[in-house]
A protein has these predicted regions:
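A Trp-anchored, charged/polar loop motif used as the substrate-binding/catalytic surface
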Residues: 65-89, 107-108
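Detector for Asparagine
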Residues: 30-31, 36, 51-54, 79-85, ...
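Extended, H/D-rich, highly charged conserved domains that either
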Residues: 1-77
Length: 171
């Protein structure tokens, strides 16, 4: 079983594209013990209760990502870019090119999305399936990074966030 982004961009190539499956991977060979897919509920607590009431913690994304050991390579990628750019300040900064495919940009992933989308020298392409999906992604992006930041990063010739309609149907 392949992954959509890899099927589109890595098919038959000797690509050096790096992937991070922050929500785990679907595989026919997985069973209930080996499946590392992350499924969640929205945060429903506020204030101190958010850290004290852990009755349903196993349903929160951050917990599942830790427990199931899903992708966190993005942290290393960000650190590598920052280290390179600080060590070689006179060279052209190393870009961070991100491609987000098949993701709702829901606020439950805000902790990761904020770090990636707001990173220095990042350029993000967000793929959408249809206009309805685009509407939802824009609305969710506003919840994640705020209206002013969305406008700043999607307007003008120096935009850092681009939306692109996916033109391929991969089964």
């Amino acid at each position: 079983m392949g992954h959509t982004f890899q099927k589109i961009y890595d098919a038959g190539t000797d690509s050096k594209i790096k992937y991070d499956y922050i929500h785990g991977k679907a595989a026919l060979s997985n069973n209930i013990d080996s499946c590392n897919l992350v499924l969640d509920i929205d945060e429903y607590l506020t204030g101190d209760a958010r850290n004290q009431d852990n009755y349903f913690i196993q349903f929160k994304k951050f917990y599942q990502r830790i427990y199931k050991g899903t992708g966190c390579h993005y942290v290393d990628w960000l650190n590598d870019v920052n280290i390179f750019n600080s060590r070689f300040p006179k060279t052209k900064p190393m870009p961070l090119n991100l491609f987000i495919y098949g993701h709702s940009l829901d606020v439950t992933d805000a902790d990761i999305l904020r770090k990636l989308l707001l990173a220095d020298n990042s350029s993000t392409t967000i793929f959408y399936h249809n206009k309805e999906a685009l509407e939802s992604q824009i609305a969710n992006l506003v919840k994640v990074i705020g209206e002013d930041e969305v406008i700043r990063r999607t307007d003008g010739s120096h935009r850092t966030i681009h939306f692109k309609q996916s033109s391929l149907d991969i089964v």
